[in-house]
Amino acid sequence: MNIVARKLHTSYNRSMKVNLLHDWQVTINQAFDIQKRLARQVSRNNEIITTPRFIAGVDISVDKAQGLGTGAVVVVGYPKLSIVETRIVQDKLEFPYIPGLLSFRESPLILAACQKLEVTPDLIMVDGQGIAHPRRVGIASHLGLLLNTPTIGCAKSLLCGSHETPDEKVASYTEIVDRGEVIGAALRTKEGAQPIFVSIGHKVDLKSAIYWVLQCCRGYRLPEPTRFAHLAAGGNIKEISPTAQAARNVVQLNLL
């Protein structure tokens, strides 16, 4: 079956550059092969600058009835975590929903949103998996490679592997292990709430990933960058900031 994913229009390119690591017009089997190749390119070493100035969160929402996706990127200033910029794009989702291949379905929207940024983030937190993925390259790793930027996977659910339940105290965590390999951490970010699943995306180690997620938590289960992006992608822009509406930029993509 020949499933075609979108190509981004090159005019949507201001601050962030996208590495052309592969074609987006691929079959499912080709997507698997691309993931296996990209997994070897993921850096598990920390390359986050000592004090990031800007941290971005990205997420996507889906209107299943219309097959429409809304991708959002919200950039915050560190350490106050106040919103600096919000970009949102909407378009039809061409690639099917296949667990483990969500990056081929969702990444084009996120990339288009990132390409419209005026501010370049030093770190991106992704609502999804990094190397905590069967082929060790979830959407956080995929985006990190494409954007050549440190990324962290901050998932709300576990895709693969197993872990012990972390203690109830905030900052407690247990390792996620799959086939004998540590691929992430089940991290308690809020007392009384389920842990989130943190993993290396690209250009970061697990210890640093956990540290920065905790630095960006402000009493909610999710770190502020991905929490804001989740709200923005769902159309709840006013919930994240009274002035965020002015920063909203909804674009109907022109696709090749």
Q: Which residues does each PLM region occupy?
A:
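A short acidic-Thr-Gly-centered motif at the start of a beta-strand
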Residues: 42-51
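Two-metal-ion RNase H-like nuclease active-site motif
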Residues: 53-63
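A glycine-rich, hydrophobic loop/mini-helix early in the fold
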Residues: 65-120
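Catalytic-site beta-strand/loop segments enriched in glycine and acidic/polar residues
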Residues: 110-141, 147-149
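A contiguous pocket-lining binding segment that forms or flanks enzyme active sites
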Residues: 133-183
